[in-house]
């Protein structure tokens, strides 16, 4: 939220830039809420319980399953947002006084925000691992460093790149945040990957890439409708997203990257 506030202030120095960022932000925040925030909220009570009971095996299972689910949700969303950013913005907001230039610039912002979506999800999940161990200081100080990096990049490169440096800086600082959180978790011996996660993670990557190719085909197939069909383009977007989701879900089930039980997060 601090990054968004800082980005908005800096973007106000360029005409219409605040609006471009606002519309892009609304879309990726929905995905973030599903892929990261919700999972973090659900697993915190369970993790805290088993940390108190010192059941390391249970803790490891919950951590890896939570990370697995966050990647299962955020990776395909990141790919879809990056591939279809212009069509998504056009279908949702490209009406009335929202010009083609506004669609193009908002889509560019969404593209770079989309690249950072897995990092945003990782931050929420990794932070929960610290909170369950009654450590709020470490993620707080790492977040401050990340915000400082974001501000520096945004201010230093704003004159050269304009408003688009803001989502780029946000994504870079978010990946920095997630990587540093992971390093501290490992150093404090609060987390480790298990074999099941590593196997499923590569399956999730494969399924996400295949979904991305399929979604790209849909976006190109319906491109004219998504960009120019004033009355029905939102329906074409819903249909494309639905088909992409079904394709991803079925492929994930087929290659055993995902099971129905995984979504329950109860162990």
Question: What would you call each of these model-derived segments?
Answer:
Residues 62, 68-83, 160, 164-189, ...:
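Short alpha-helical transmembrane segments in multi-pass integral membrane proteins
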Residues 36-55, 63, 127:
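Helix-loop junctions and terminal segments of transmembrane helices
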Residues 28-46, 70-79:
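Small-residue-rich midsections of specific transmembrane alpha-helices
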Residues 115, 122-156, 164-171:
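Alpha-helical transmembrane segments of multi-pass membrane transporters/permeases
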Residues 9-31, 101-107, 239-240:
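Interfacial/gating helices of multi-pass transporter permease domains
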Residues 217-267:
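Membrane-proximal transmembrane or re-entrant/amphipathic helices at the cytosolic face
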Residues 126-134, 182-200, 223-227, 258:
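Alpha-helical transmembrane segments
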Residues 84-116, 227-231:
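Interfacial segments at transmembrane-helix termini and the short loops linking adjacent helices
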């Amino acid at each position: 939220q601090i990054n968004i506030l800082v980005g908005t202030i800096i973007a106000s120095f360029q005409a219409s830039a605040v609006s471009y960022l606002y519309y892009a932000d609304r879309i990726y925040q929905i995905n973030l809420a599903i892929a990261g925030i919700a999972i973090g909220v659900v697993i915190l009570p369970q993790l805290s319980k088993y940390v108190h009971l010192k059941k390391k095996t249970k803790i490891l299972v919950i951590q890896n399953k939570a990370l697995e689910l966050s990647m299962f949700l955020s990776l395909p969303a990141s790919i879809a947002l990056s591939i279809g950013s212009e069509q998504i913005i056009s279908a949702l907001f490209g009406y009335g006084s929202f010009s083609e230039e506004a669609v193009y610039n908002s889509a560019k912002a969404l593209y770079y925000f989309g690249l950072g979506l897995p990092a945003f999800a990782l931050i929420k999940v990794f932070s929960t691992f610290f909170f369950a161990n009654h450590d709020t200081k470490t993620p707080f100080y790492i977040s401050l460093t990340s915000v400082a990096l974001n501000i520096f990049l945004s201010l230093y490169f704003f004159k050269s790149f304009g408003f688009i440096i803001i989502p780029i800086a946000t994504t870079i600082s978010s990946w920095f945040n997630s990587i540093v959180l992971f390093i501290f978790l490992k150093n404090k011996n609060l987390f480790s990957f298990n074999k099941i996660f590593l196997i499923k993670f590569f399956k999730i990557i494969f399924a996400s890439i295949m979904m991305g190719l399929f979604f790209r085909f849909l976006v190109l197939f319906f491109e004219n409708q998504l960009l120019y069909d004033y009355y029905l383009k939102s329906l074409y977007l819903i249909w494309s997203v639905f088909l992409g989701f079904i394709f991803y879900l079925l492929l994930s089930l087929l290659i055993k990257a995902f099971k129905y039980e995984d979504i329950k997060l109860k162990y």
